[in-house]
């Protein structure tokens, strides 16, 4: 219960206001979490509307089952399954898709989930602990090259190669020391390698982010769900995405820009601009948390919300 109480939904009012353009429409909350956005969306919807939410976390599913509203349903799966899951429910078009990316406060604050370096716990990091490979299992087999690429690309960590070598060296000591399977030891290994310190940031921050993104296939799933959302949105429907680090935001920004721009055509070809297909999206805005929200919830500090609208049928 304590974790539930500590969770604060970021950009709650702004996201819901941007999302709901048709009170009687069909909406998707791709990241139910602890239900802050879903409950606020339901409060704005008409009796005939529908809200379909997704989450991989079994605890989120438990929370969602407490919502006794005939307009609401929850899918225990990644938002990457959105297209097929909605088709199975007879939904061809939606009025809006909301994505609140990243890891939630209850997940970070629970040492047993293995997301945080701030408290020792099992090295898991899976959004759904019942599926897939844990962080410890991946670290037990990954090569120096794979470790380097993941930590460099997903953590933007300049000491990625040195960290990868240290992790493989630690693995060679498994017979004597046992497996590397706790967040505390991982943070300690990274701390010994990363000699420079970013103000206000633990040396292990980037490595933990990178491993979490890899274990959960977060960026690949994000690209899949953006494509799905574009095809599912009806004319006038909104795509609202909240991201918390530059890797996610870059993907969202480029996606929206690419689909809000006219296709590039060789100037030498005899094609008039009016004959080109119209871009499917219009970018509405980019928003950030207010100073008051950041003061009340420091984890909101890095949030960026981007909104786009489908303008073609």
Swiss-Prot record:
Its EC number is 2.1.1.199. It comes from the Bacteria. The gene is rsmH. InterPro entries: RsmH (IPR002903), SAM-dep_MeTrfase_MraW_recog (IPR023397), SAM-dependent_MTases_sf (IPR029063). One of its GO terms (cellular component) is cytoplasm. Keywords: Cytoplasm, Methyltransferase, rRNA processing, S-adenosyl-L-methionine, Transferase. GO terms for biological process: rRNA base methylation. It catalyses: cytidine(1402) in 16S rRNA + S-adenosyl-L-methionine = N(4)-methylcytidine(1402) in 16S rRNA + S-adenosyl-L-homocysteine + H(+). One of its GO terms (molecular function) is rRNA (cytosine-N4-)-methyltransferase activity. Belongs to the methyltransferase superfamily. RsmH family. S-adenosyl-L-methionine binds at residues 35-37, 55, 79, 100, 107. Its main location: cytoplasm. Specifically methylates the N4 position of cytidine in position 1402 (C1402) of 16S rRNA. It is an enzyme of class 2 (transferase). This is Ribosomal RNA small subunit methyltransferase H. It holds the Pfam family Methyltransf_5. It is found in: Cytoplasm.
């Amino acid at each position: 219960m304590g974790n539930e109480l500590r969770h604060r939904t970021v950009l709650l009012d702004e996201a819901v206001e941007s999302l709901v353009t048709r009170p009687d429409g069909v909406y998707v909350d791709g990241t139910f979490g602890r239900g802050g956005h879903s409950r606020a969306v339901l409060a704005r919807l008409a009796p005939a509307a529908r809200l379909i939410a997704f989450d991989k976390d079994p605890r989120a599913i438990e929370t969602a089952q407490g919502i006794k509203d005939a307009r609401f349903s929850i899918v225990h799966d990644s938002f990457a399954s959105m297209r097929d899951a909605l088709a199975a429910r007879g939904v061809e078009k939606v009025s809006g898709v909301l994505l609140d990316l990243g890891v939630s406060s209850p997940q970070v604050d629970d040492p047993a989930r293995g997301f945080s370096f701030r408290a020792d716990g099992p090295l898991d990091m899976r959004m759904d602990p019942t599926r897939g490979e844990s962080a410890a299992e991946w670290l037990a087999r990954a090569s120096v090259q794979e470790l380097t690429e993941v930590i460099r690309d997903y953590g933007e960590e300049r000491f990625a190669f040195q960290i990868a070598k240290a992790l493989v060296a630690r693995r060679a000591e498994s017979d004597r020391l046992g497996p590397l399977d706790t967040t505390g030891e991982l943070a300690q290994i990274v701390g010994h390698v990363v000699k420079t310190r970013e103000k206000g940031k633990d040396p292990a921050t980037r490595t933990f982010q990178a491993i979490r993104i890899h274990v959960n296939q977060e960026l690949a799933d994000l690209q899949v769900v953006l494509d799905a959302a574009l095809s599912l949105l009806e004319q006038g429907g909104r795509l609202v995405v909240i991201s918390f680090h530059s890797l996610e935001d870059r993907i969202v920004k480029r996606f929206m820009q690419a689909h809000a721009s006219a296709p590039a055509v060789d100037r030498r070809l005899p094609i008039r601009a009016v004959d080109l297909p119209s871009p499917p999206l219009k970018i509405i805005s980019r928003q950030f948390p207010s100073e008051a929200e950041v003061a009340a919830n420091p984890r909101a500090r890095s949030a960026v919300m981007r909104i786009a609208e489908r303008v073609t049928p």
